[in-house]
Amino acid sequence: MGASLPPKEANLFKLIVKSYETKQYKKGLKAADAILKKFPDHGETLSMKGLTLNCMDRKTEAYELVRLGVKNDIKSHVCWHVLGLLYRSDREYREAIKCYRNALRIDPDNLEILRDLSLLQAQMRDLSGFVETRQQLLTLKPNHRMNWIGFAVSQHLNANASKAVEILEAYEGTLEDDYPPENELIEHTEMILYKVSLLEESGSFDKALEELHKKEPKIVDKLSYKEQEVSLLSKVGRLEEANKLYRVLLSMNPDNYRYHEGLQKCLGLYSESGQYSSDQIEKLNALYQSLSEQYTRSSAVKRIPLDFLQDENFKEAVAKYIKPLLTKGVPSLFSDLSSLYDHPRKPDILEQLVVEMKHSIGTTGSFPGSDVKEPPSTLLWTLFFLAQHYDRRGQYDVALCKIDEAIAHTPTVIDLYSVKSRIMKHAGDLTAAAALADEARGMDLADRYINSECVKRMLQADQVPLAEKTAVLFTKEGDQLNNLHDMQCMWYDLASGDSYFRQGDLGRALKKFLAVEKHYADISEDQFDFHSYCLRKMTLRSYVDMLKFQDRLHSFPYFHKAAIRAIRCYLKLHDSPKSTAGEDEMSKLAPAQKKKIKKQKKAEARAKKEAESKSEESTASGASKSGKRNVKPVDPDPHGQKLIQVEEPMAEASKYLRLLQKHSPNSLETHLLSFEVNMRKQKFLLAFQAVKQLLKLGAENPDSHRSLVKFFLMTESISAPTTEAEKLRWRVLEAERPSISQLQNKSLMEANKEFLGRHEDSLVHRAAYAEMLYILDPSKKTEAIKIIEDSTNKVVQTNEALGQAREWKLKDCIAVHTLLDTVLLDSQAASRWKSRCAEYFPCSTHFEGKHCSLMPDSVYNSSRKSNENGDTPNHPMGQTELSDGQLEAFKSLSVAT
């Protein structure tokens, strides 16, 4: 570096490099300017000056200088390396790799460039290139441990675990007999356990077990040793030994559910589906009775039997489990037992049991069959549990009654107001839910979780400004909304995006949904620093697990939800474009002219973007000269207006659709959106492929049925094909149609009728039938409406201890109301449906039920009026919280407790 310079300037060049490494950017710039004064065309100095400016957020100048440096000294590996570093800093990894490869053509044995290249190859999952680079590093420096380990890991990632084992064995052959020293015991342990895991992954279980036992004296992590050993013993079929070892592990941690699962598998008693034979139940019961005698304080040992016990045995066990927790006052008890509600009989048993407990405590002060007096709080937590139970079963009136009783008993418990808020949300009164959540928040202004719950309720009630003010109470001073974004608060972005979408503000909605995508990009970027760190620290198993996690990152729920919502925004933009005079003129032009104008617009947009970028940098350059990174620039599009001005919404939607198809292929929504997008793009074969996937994943799903009917109705309505491509497409569709069982020897009308016959008792299926009937034959609109109105809201079979639960869900009823109003276009039918549903959901603001907060004479508003008139307040905080913690917007809202 700097070899072509005289000694004085060469020393200055070394100073530039040192200043860059120590982040003394002003000092580095001064040295670079001193060299360039005498040698203005020195490529390496220009490149280093550009690299320094890049660290000071003067990116445009940086790229200009570095590219000039490469131009002036194209045969310098330093210039190419620096250009690669610039691209890497901007996440342009493919361009950076090209630059590194150019640098290596000039200096093929440069260790620093090879290391940087290997990091990028690992990041981009260029696994064959990663193997090649790590092998080259090992060849150049075989006495460096990290090069051996890096080569082994590269082979492992490239699906060659056996080769990775060979490399680790070769490395072990270079070590002394007394290795490792005291200060490297942990690193060596990690390497041994990693090697054993590789043998396990390659299927060499016996060899892995032998290696583990052989190296036991050198392994200091005894817990990992035991966990690895028991896993291998199970896989080689030595179940008796595995059984004993799992019991040893349980003695160390009896609340580890993985150990319980492993023990059950060893005994042949584990069930993936949760269904057990009577013999399995008997053996499991005996096992956990013996374990409960050993581990009297273990909650897992008490909780696990509730999953497999039935009837009276279940009732006895669950009573024994919940009594001490109700006495203690554990708010999370219902969450703990919520999985039991997936079993057919257990919720009824729970209800009967807890109702008996509540009655007994209320009358005698003790649990049934006990003489021990319970503290007053036991009744409170019993009511608290019952409220959540009835909420889960859809009996919102009973749930509200129970939670009000609990509040009357002890009006100072915050959890009661949070649960009442949740019940009101489920019952359909989102405004009241937000007010209650704010009331709970006001009782403890330092509780971040309660604050977040309140924000969520406000967003669900479309009170976005209030939600923002509340959310930023727990962010840093300064630019609080940006701080909220930096915290990667994805639930907030999704909830606020949903609110904007409901309000028709597609710009802001898209802004929020794409912010979630940005969070995922940042998470993916965060792995970069670990490629070298984990090899250096020898945390190899965690490193490989992290890479596997990153590979499936986009399959996680938040990204899935954000991508689906973003696609729906683009669909709405496509269906309702904002036409302008310019667009009207465009529609009159010939295709060639349109193409030319579009090309010009793209070039203008690109030039404008570059100009804006330069303007931002020049504005920020004053602060940059200090040598420190700038504060974040102001968002040029805070309301997302540029996002909704996209020329081709379907092209943008397709980007996110491809990610969903790759990472969420088993989601019905993925293929439903694929159908919607491809129908709009007139890519009929892809749309048909989506229909087939929908039928494969859920043939009886109403949306699958809708898509099937819409697709073949469209194919029947299109004129005869003229081009060869169109003819081929129709031949494919004609050949494939008989493979659809729903349409074999049937017309679409007949298939629709059969669909209704299979689901006569389901509201959502009747609605799907009615919609398709109207689309197939608009003259049958009256019949379609009658099919919906003849639906019956049946009572769900329960023990009917308190009230009755009905089948219809609020969201389904709202969807049917929207269908009647906007698709079938019958306002009178929609009004009749609204009145009918108001009876079933009296708290729903959508249906304006008699108990919802919109009604002036509702129970809620009457209650608030009585408080204001001086009657006994039914809320502990009265007017105090209105001035101390509760938001002003809720002062006028009446919510009874």
UniProtKB/Swiss-Prot annotation:
Biased composition (Polar residues): 863-872
A GO-annotated cellular component: cytoplasm
Stored SMART domains: TPR
Domain of life: Eukaryota
Family matches, as Pfam families: NatA_aux_su, TPR_1
Induction profile: Down-regulated upon abscisic acid treatment.
Expression tissues: Expressed in leaves, roots, shoots and flowers.
TPR repeats: 77-110, 111-144, 189-222, 223-256, 298-331, 380-413, 488-523
Residue stretches of biased makeup (Basic and acidic residues): 602-617
Record key words, sorted: Repeat, TPR repeat
Chain intervals for the UniProt region annotation (Disordered): 578-640, 863-897
PROSITE patterns: TPR (PS50005), TPR_REGION (PS50293)
Membrane-spanning ranges: none
Disruption-associated phenotype: Embryo lethal when homozygous.
PANTHER family: N(ALPHA)-ACETYLTRANSFERASE 15_16, ISOFORM A, N-TERMINAL ACETYLTRANSFERASE-RELATED
Known function: Auxiliary subunit of the NatA N-alpha-acetyltransferase complex. Required for male gametocyte development, embryogenesis, suspensor development and the formation of the quiescent center (QC) in the root meristem. Involved in plant immunity through the regulation of SNC1 stability. Required for embryo development.
Subunit structure of this chain's protein: Part of the NatA complex. Associates with ribosomes. Interacts with NAA10.
Record-given protein name: N-terminal acetyltransferase A complex auxiliary subunit NAA15
